[in-house]
């Protein structure tokens, strides 16, 4: 059985933890392992932080959109912003690359997403924002939404 949740919130750094916890609570019905849940929470944190810091460049008037779809033992996340977009996506996906070194960012966001998720697709257009599609296949077959 398919179950879907949509969430939108202001691009404020304090909303990152709200997004992480809300997504984790929704996914809990699939009975993920603690490792899987931690990985998904980390990925949500990275993607939301990227939207706030890089997409909207700290402008709190921006909106971050999250969609979560649960199907059997699969989680599909979409995290989207309508910010400035990514100038060079290939460069941005390189480990340690950051456009904000003055903020002491590690530049590992996309690398973490690619390591923790089974599928990662990033679509970005300058001046039109970025959409990140993430898929995780859970190892536990005792999903409650089946």
Curated annotation (Swiss-Prot):
This is Anti-sigma F factor. Gene3D superfamilies: Histidine kinase-like ATPase, C-terminal domain (3.30.565.10). It is an enzyme of class 2 (transferase). Binds to sigma F and blocks its ability to form an RNA polymerase holoenzyme (E-sigma F). Phosphorylates SpoIIAA on a serine residue. This phosphorylation may enable SpoIIAA to act as an anti-anti-sigma factor that counteracts SpoIIAB and thus releases sigma F from inhibition. One of its GO terms (biological process) is asexual sporulation. SMART domains: HATPase_c. Keywords: ATP-binding, Kinase, Nucleotide-binding, Serine/threonine-protein kinase, Sporulation, Transferase. It comes from Bacillus cytotoxicus (strain DSM 22905 / CIP 110041 / 391-98 / NVH 391-98). It catalyses: L-seryl-[protein] + ATP = O-phospho-L-seryl-[protein] + ADP + H(+); L-threonyl-[protein] + ATP = O-phospho-L-threonyl-[protein] + ADP + H(+). Pfam families: HATPase_c_2 (PF13581). It comes from the Bacteria. InterPro entries: Anti-sigma-factor_SerPK, Anti-sigma_F, HATPase_C_sf. Belongs to the anti-sigma-factor family. GO terms for molecular function: ATP binding; protein serine kinase activity; protein serine/threonine kinase activity; sigma factor antagonist activity. Its EC number is 2.7.11.1.
